[in-house]
Amino acid sequence: MTTQKIVPTKSTDGSKLFRHQAKFVAGAMNINQILNFSLPEIAFVGKSNVGKSSLINTICNNKNLAKVSNTPGRTRQINFFNLADKLIIVDLPGYGFANVPISVKEQWGVLISYYLRNSYNLRLVNLLIDSRRGIKENDKKVADLLLANKREFQIIFTKSDKVTDHKNLHDEAQNFLATLNYSCNVMYVSNRSKEGARELKASLAKCIKPQK
């Protein structure tokens, strides 16, 4: 399997792209339901209740786009959202949630792993980490999977308004990346204060196809 490199766009800040309204286009509860949209895809992955759906709603300026719940494990399928026929935003089920049957956790694991390994159109993965919890073993396993499949990814610390010192997070991320021999963006975002939203949009806008 081959992947294509991120191609810079004319819009450097992403604001023009994200003025458009994103819409839900499909959900996949098993690998046979995963569709090929022939558009660049950017995925959000992380532990249950890390804030994936809320972050998607924040950058798309629509609090009702992706279903949000305070109960971990509510996203039980891969959800696909079309942004202006230029980009597919992918909300993956959370991992590491204990209060579901083992069979369900295994099903989610297979679904997440299959998508990350096999999506031809996947351009960038956003690995979301709860700022209050730091990088955990499951996060490291996902990063290993991404590297093994030559996937571009960046680290997004969510709920950054809940911590007062980002330096420890930065040091933790850099030490983690050093063990992987990998370099990438490290961002801090807050759905409440909107910190980091503009920078995140800019990084995602670089993934769309160049205008002809």
UniProtKB/Swiss-Prot annotation:
GO terms for molecular function: GTP binding; metal ion binding. Residues 38-210 form the EngB-type G domain. Pfam families: MMR_HSR1. Keywords: Cell cycle, Cell division, GTP-binding, Magnesium, Metal-binding, Nucleotide-binding, Septation. Gene3D superfamilies: P-loop containing nucleotide triphosphate hydrolases. Its cofactor is Mg(2+). InterPro entries: G_ENGB_dom (IPR030393), GTP-bd (IPR006073), GTP-bd_ribosome_bio_YsxC (IPR019987), P-loop_NTPase (IPR027417). GTP binds at residues 46-53, 73-77, 91-94, 158-161, 189-191. Mg(2+) binds at residues 53, 75. The keyword Magnesium applies. PANTHER family: ENGB-TYPE G DOMAIN-CONTAINING PROTEIN, MSS1/TRME-RELATED GTP-BINDING PROTEIN. Belongs to the TRAFAC class TrmE-Era-EngA-EngB-Septin-like GTPase superfamily. EngB GTPase family. This is Probable GTP-binding protein EngB. It comes from Rickettsia conorii (strain ATCC VR-613 / Malish 7). The lineage of its organism: Bacteria, Pseudomonadati, Pseudomonadota, Alphaproteobacteria, Rickettsiales.
